[in-house]
């Protein structure tokens, strides 16, 4: 048989709605490659729940390397430790060009904790990272062959004329991420509670969207019950329908302190919606959110600072509108055609 142009080893979810950042990034890149080269030229192995059928997974993985001209792997931090050594072993027999589509910003810390991984990473012909500071941090640690591949989405971007001055007294805020404590969801709740108290009434509501891990279901149920007057959880949104969901909101809250944060995909959703982002100054968030320009940055684990940032936008509607317009201007930078140009060139070498 003719060899596939590229084989991709990644997490594509369990067949339901795709919600976590790793699966969304891998799925979007794969779809764009299939659109450009045809599905018959792109081979895929899904690493989701591979432990349920390990023999079948290993065989498919081996065949992917054997039958592809170039092989890309898209692991997050846990998968890296399992899948990269396995890929290197299989590739010993075939010597394919290897690509690491890096998910998040975990690699610098992983190298610091496990310096032996540096040699393994330098066996890749190309590593595609999400932000310039991730690239710099990896280069400082001796990693080579680094390219840029930011997050990307093909969305129905709002028009500039849609961004009008919001004069409503009552506003809606949202959290649009995995619903877990290290994403700052409890800080967001506390901040909205504080903001309403300072405003002297129930003027701000908060909606959660995103994947809810089973280990957090009980805790979220408690939070929803305790804050029923202003808090709701709406489940998972299709990754290509985010603009339609986010349009009614005043701002997005992202008070994360998750250890593997890189380029959060929800920023691209906010850019295409023209939605101001209030985010923590954590890891690589400042690569995408410029304080006072297209969002506001706050310290981590600080509901009071988050409350102050919410009220800053609430009380200065012209600032809110300008930040929204600035965000909308950034959307074009994260369209698939612009983002994947270098990646396509590497594949076609």
For each of these PLM feature ranges, what is it?
Residues 7-9, 164-183, 188-194, 206-207:
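Conserved donor-binding/catalytic core segment of Leloir-type glycosyltransferases
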Residues 46, 204-218, 235:
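Glycosyltransferase donor-sugar binding loop
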């Amino acid at each position: 048989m003719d060899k596939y142009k590229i084989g991709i080893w990644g997490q594509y979810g369990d067949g339901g709605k795709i919600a976590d950042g790793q699966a969304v990034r891998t799925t979007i890149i794969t779809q764009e490659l299939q659109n450009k080269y045809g599905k018959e030229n792109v081979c895929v192995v899904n690493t989701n729940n591979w432990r349920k059928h390990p023999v079948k997974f290993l065989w498919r993985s081996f065949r992917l390397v054997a039958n592809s001209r170039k092989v890309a792997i898209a692991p997050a931090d846990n998968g890296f430790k399992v899948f990269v050594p396995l890929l290197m072993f299989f590739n010993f027999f075939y010597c394919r060009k290897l690509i690491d589509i890096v998910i998040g910003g975990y690699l610098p810390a992983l190298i610091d904790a496990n310096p032996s991984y540096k040699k393994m990473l330098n066996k890749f012909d190309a590593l595609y990272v999400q932000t310039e500071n991730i690239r710099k941090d990896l280069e400082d640690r001796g990693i080579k062959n680094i390219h840029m591949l930011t997050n990307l989405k093909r969305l129905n971007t709002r028009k500039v004329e849609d961004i009008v001055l919001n004069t409503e007294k009552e506003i809606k805020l949202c959290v649009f991420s995995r619903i877990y404590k290290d994403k700052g969801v409890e800080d967001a709740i506390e901040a909205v509670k504080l903001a309403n108290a300072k405003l002297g009434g129930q003027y701000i509501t908060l909606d959660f969207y995103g994947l809810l891990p089973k280990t957090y279901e009980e805790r979220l149920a408690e939070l929803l019950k305790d804050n029923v007057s202003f808090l709701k959880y709406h489940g998972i949104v299709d990754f290509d329908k985010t603009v339609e969901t986010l349009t009614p909101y005043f701002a997005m809250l992202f008070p994360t302190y998750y250890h593997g944060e890189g380029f959060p995909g929800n920023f691209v959703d906010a850019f295409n919606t023209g939605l101001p982002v209030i985010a923590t100054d954590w890891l690589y968030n400042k690569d995408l959110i410029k304080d006072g320009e297209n969002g506001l940055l706050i310290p981590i684990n600080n509901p009071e600072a988050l409350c102050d940032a919410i009220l800053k936008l609430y009380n200065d509607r012209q600032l809110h509108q300008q930040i929204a317009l600035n965000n909308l201007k950034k959307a074009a930078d994260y369209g698939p055609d612009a983002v994947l140009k270098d990646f396509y060139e590497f594949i076609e070498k």
